[in-house]
Amino acid sequence: MEFPFAIFAENCNFVEIAFVATQFPLKFIQFHRFNPTPLNDFFMFITCCALLLSIFGEIHRLNVANAKPIEKSPTELWMEEQGLVDITTVVPGIHVSLMYARSDNFVGRVMYRDLRRAYLLPETAEALKKAQTALQKAHPELSLKVYDATRPMSVQQQMWNIVAGTSKSIYVSNPKNGGGLHNYGLAVDITLCWRNDLRTAQGKLLHAAGDTTGLSMGTPIDYLGKMAHVRDETAHFQRGWLSKAHLERRKWLRNAMEAAGFKVLPTEWWHFNFKTRAQAKAHYKIVR
């Protein structure tokens, strides 16, 4: 008897599929047994297990094939209406983990309620693509990882309201003064991570498929202190506060970004601007 399992799998939920899958071998397969011995029982068990694995593999394949892309949020759709682009559609293999979509950032709050994609102006995204190419030409095992990109001025105002009057205020551009280059789509907060698509000659992944952890750079992104200052790196190394690996990785990041036209912010090793503030005010619009 032929059972149209693929059609069934597309129209049932997982619980229903699992139930039928467990019944499938016994209801639709007849095993020829020469003798009712423990050995034959063992082979029957192995055959059933193999069939179950095959069935669930087909279910997974169908789920992947029929999976719908995650719908874009209102903020993300609005970003695109402003002419901004999702950087993952421009920069091959780049990784994104927006730190203000979580609470583990220097303000300690979730600032991006429905923003998970990183957006930039098209020319900034194209420059980031060049930076990724430059990085992987020098270090094929690495990739860029973005922690923040375009930040709407409305969010900038919320951040300013949180830090105003505190020691943290020097790290947030005052909206009354025009904000910062994040508000124009002309800046990124970025680090290095391992690529998760490289394989050995034997086909083994060099790094776990889900391992896109940022490399240690001496401080976390958003660290408020002198160890994040680019100009003091050598002194921090001499004091033993930064390692040789930290200095090398920061240099690799700067080399790649500067090759594409970005400039590092001297007090934040992770922050890169694509234009000056004067250029932004003269030629670009703030993302509200």
Protein language model annotation of sequence segments:
Residues 61-149, 161-267, 277-288:
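Extracytoplasmic cell-surface/polysaccharide-interacting catalytic and binding patches
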Residues 153-159, 272-279:
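Beta-rich nucleic-acid/ligand-interaction surfaces
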